[in-house]
């Protein structure tokens, strides 16, 4: 992960940069170690982890984290599959 991709939302606040880095590291941890064990389960395109990375990079840790949480809550067997991109 390069520092330039940690926050594309333009924040220079060091705290936000740290929070973003931690959130992105947790997503990478999930992708590398947990996801291979449980297999593909996401009902959307892009996957929830890819969505989370993009949302945090584009909108910063707070709005990006909120969008990611909302997406995770929508990803269950009773929701129809489909394309759900990160909003602008």
Curated annotation (Swiss-Prot):
Pfam family, one: YidD
GO cellular component, one term: plasma membrane
Membrane topology, record value: Peripheral membrane protein
Signal sequence region: none
Cysteine pairs bridged by disulfides in the record: none
UniProt entry keywords in alphabetical sequence: Cell inner membrane, Cell membrane, Membrane
Function: Could be involved in insertion of integral membrane proteins into the membrane.
Annotated family: Belongs to the UPF0161 family.
Protein name: Putative membrane protein insertion efficiency factor
